[in-house]
From Swiss-Prot:
Gene of this entry: acpS
Residues holding Mg(2+): D8, E60
InterPro entries: 4-PPantetheinyl_Trfase_dom, 4-PPantetheinyl_Trfase_dom_sf, ACPS, Ppantetheine-prot_Trfase_dom
Catalysed reaction, written as an equation: apo-[ACP] + CoA = holo-[ACP] + adenosine 3',5'-bisphosphate + H(+)
Name of the protein described by the UniProt record: Holo-[acyl-carrier-protein] synthase
Record carries keyword Lipid metabolism: yes
Length: 128
């Protein structure tokens, strides 16, 4: 059963402006929003702003799918990249919210084209 659905679109230029802006501001944003593994992945790519935008969209989509629970931090939501499709790891209050909803699986898809990054998150489970 589908327990939650979230969709988000991020303009890549918005993230590019942050990355190209004052270094201290960019670092604060990256440290507050992205886990070290996400940063390592994005920073190793030529299109890093696009990669960051897709991950930011994934986090926004996940929060929407969870019902916008209070207190969830960006770092409670981590996009992981194994050998296949990206996945979303939940920690902290995000994991607590998922448990309360009865979430068994989190599905994530990312795409980017024409200056935007899009993410969709589907929460699947049996319910509370």
């Amino acid at each position: 059963m589908i327990l939650g659905l979230g969709l988000d679109v991020v303009e890549v230029a918005r993230i590019q402006r942050i990355l190209a802006g004052p270094p201290a501001r960019a670092e604060r944003f990256l440290a507050r929003v992205f886990a070290p593994s996400e940063r390592a992945y994005c920073d190793a790519r030529q299109d890093r702003a696009t990669r960051y935008a897709a991950r930011f969209a994934a986090k926004e989509a996940a929060v929407k799918a969870l019902g916008t629970p209070e207190g969830v931090r960006w770092l409670d939501l981590v996009v992981e990249r194994g050998s296949g499709a990206p996945s979303l790891a939940l920690d902290g209050l995000a994991a607590d919210a998922a448990r309360r909803l009865g979430v068994a699986r989190v599905h994530l898809t990312l795409t980017h084209d024409a200056g935007v990054a899009v993410a969709a998150v589907i929460l699947e489970g049996t319910g509370p």
